[in-house]
Curated annotation (Swiss-Prot):
GO terms for cellular component: ciliary basal body; cytoplasm; extracellular region; microtubule; motile cilium. It is found in: Cytoplasm, Cytoskeleton; Cytoplasm, Cytoskeleton, Cilium basal body; Cytoplasm, Cytoskeleton, Cilium axoneme; Cell projection, Cilium, Flagellum. This is Polyglutamylase complex subunit TTLL1. Part of the neuronal tubulin polyglutamylase complex which contains TPGS1, TPGS2, TTLL1, LRRC49 and NICN1. Interacts with PCM1, CSTPP1 and LRRC49. Mg(2+) 2 binds at residues 326, 328. Gln-144 is the main determinant for regioselectivity, which segregates between initiases and elongases in all tubulin--tyrosine ligase family. A glutamine residue at this position is found in elongases TTLL6, TTLL9, TTLL11, TTLL13, TTLL10 and favors glutamate-chain elongation, whereas an arginine residue is found in initiases TTLL2, TTLL4, TTLL5, TTLL3, TTLL8 and favors initiation. It comes from Homo sapiens. Mg(2+) 1 binds at residues 313, 326. Expressed in a wide range of tissues. Has a stronger expression in heart, brain and testis. Residues 391-423 are annotated as: Disordered.
């Protein structure tokens, strides 16, 4: 009989530990021989640092890629997507097609974004083109809505820059980088409230790219009705959907936690907008997720000991266009409601079934192609090997989320095009 998997974690969450114990795995310390380490992003940095000089053996796997930040840091994600667009343009790919105003027809899925302080002059130029716009500033390396604020005047950003420079604890050399993005001020509202989507995406390998979408994502709602009014720019209960912020609101509901399941959203949209339009929206969401992964795949350290479950944040505007806002390397495993706890327990269970075949001691040399029976609530979102195989187009087109891309005779209202191939 094979030995038991030895596990370590530095994240004390019951949804993790219960899953390990259910499998009969054995807990050890990080200084002992371990097979599976569910670690924080800080720890992964140390494990793969040159100074650590640590080499993982074939029977060890971890839950982050070494340079996951190429996707999960807001500034690097945007940089990689911009590079990806340029490369496709250079290749003459139809995906990089632009309209008469120079806007990408298909790859325009991230709001206009600049890095600060590096791109300050470029930002000012853009700001002056549409001075009535609202922009959202976010620190590159923080999560849960920390350090975010909205601006609609250049004087506000000048004040921020001045305050940052004169701050006694922030030197100019290591001043925290921010991104500033055009704020989506026409979000789709339900019950007058803004919401976003949190979707879970598992990547088992980047080269070839193989990723899975979790079917049980959810919507996070603001507790206060949305208004684009400048008087409410500082009210984060109106603008930010993060549970870490909304749970402090007077109207926060501790029973449902201000959340809807994705399937409820789908039913709502089918009844209010129609089935075809709703299917097109979800196809497009799936498509932009795959494009974001393709954008970072060339620069990602595709270490065979790694897999990663990302939390994708998507906002839908009132024209039913989805926007990729950010990607989280460590989506929260804290449970805000009973349903939340069940969802996250099942998410970890299904993730482990794919990452650790049969719950046996890992062998990082396996082909990372689990049988369909173990996918649970995951479904294959994209499989590069399959996409490049003979007859793959027909196979892929028959799957949910695999049908976006250029086509003849599109119109702006009929949806932003349907792809005939994923190659």
């Amino acid at each position: 009989m094979a030995g038991k998997v030895k596990w370590v974690t530095d994240i004390e969450k019951s949804v993790l530990i219960n899953n390990f114990e259910k499998r009969g795995w054995v807990q050890v310390t990080e200084n002992e021989d371990w097979n599976f380490y569910w670690m924080s992003v800080q720890t992964i940095r140390n494990v793969f640092s040159v100074e650590a000089g640590y080499r993982l053996s074939d029977d060890q796997i971890v839950n982050h890629f070494p340079n996951h930040y190429e996707l999960t840091r807001k500034d690097l994600m945007v940089k990689n997507i911009k590079r990806y667009r340029k490369e496709l343009e250079k290749e003459g790919s139809p995906l990089a097609e632009k309209d008469e105003n120079g806007k990408y027809l298909y790859l325009d899925f991230v709001p206009v974004t600049y890095m600060l302080p590096a791109d300050y002059n470029l930002f000012v130029e853009e700001f002056r083109k549409s001075p009535s716009s609202t922009w959202i500033m976010k620190p590159c390396g923080k999560a849960q809505g920390k350090g975010i604020f909205l601006i609609n005047k250049l004087s506000q950003i000048k004040k921020w820059s001045r305050d940052s420079k004169t701050s006694s604890f922030v030197s100019q050399s290591n001043k925290e980088a921010y991104v500033i993005s055009l704020y989506i001020n026409n979000p789709l509202l339900i019950g007058g409230r803004k919401f976003d989507l949190r979707l879970y995406v598992l990547v088992s390998t980047y080269r070839p790219l193989r990723c899975y979408m979790y079917k049980l994502g959810f919507c996070r709602f603001c507790t206060v009705k949305y208004t684009p009014s400048t008087s409410e720019l500082d009210n984060m209960f109106v603008h930010l959907t993060n549970v870490a912020i909304q749970k402090h609101g007077e109207d926060y509901n501790h029973i449902h936690g201000g959340k809807w399941t994705v399937s409820n959203l789908r039913l709502y949209l089918e009844s209010t907008r129609g089935k075809e339009v709703t299917s097109k929206l979800f196809d497009e969401i799936h498509w932009i997720i795959v494009q974001s992964l393709k954008a970072v795949a060339p620069v990602m350290n595709n270490d065979k000991h790694c897999f990663e479950c990302y939390g994708y944040d998507i906002i839908i505007d009132d024209k039913l266009k989805p926007w990729l806002i950010e990607v989280n390397a460590s989506p929260s495993l804290t449970s805000s409601t009973a349903n939340d706890r069940i969802l996250k327990y099942n998410l970890i269970n299904d993730t482990l079934n794919i990452a650790v075949p049969n719950g046996e001691i890992p062998d990082c040399k396996w082909n990372k192609s689990p049988p369909k029976e173990v996918l649970g609530n995951y479904e294959i979102l994209y499989d590069e090997e399959l996409a490049q195989g003979d007859g793959a187009d027909r196979e892929l087109r028959s799957r949910q989320g695999q049908s976006l891309g250029p086509r003849a005779g599109r119109s702006r209202d009929s949806g932003r095009a349907v792809l005939t191939t994923w190659k």
